[in-house]
Amino acid sequence: MFSWLLVRGHSMEPSAREGDFVFVWKLFFSPKKEDMVVFRSPVSNELFLKRVTKIQQDNCWLQGDNALDSQDSRQFGWVPKTAILGKAYVIHR
């Protein structure tokens, strides 16, 4: 249904800062452009927080808001919608 995650890193600044919490809604979710989402990296299997910038059929292009400090679709390409765990809502600490 939902979970809480702690933000680590700077890739989503200023929207989400290191130490912030995100509430991740997992039910009845279909990603839309500009959504902030949590997904499993296709490279390392780590959980990442990124923003949906493009949608193409069953895949999303995901990028960090802080382009200078983000490992995202610019490195690993399109991410299948099935890898997205849910929509994230930032709760600042």
Regions flagged by a language model, labelled:
Residues M1-R93:
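Extended hydrophobic leader/signal-anchor segments used for secretion and membrane insertion
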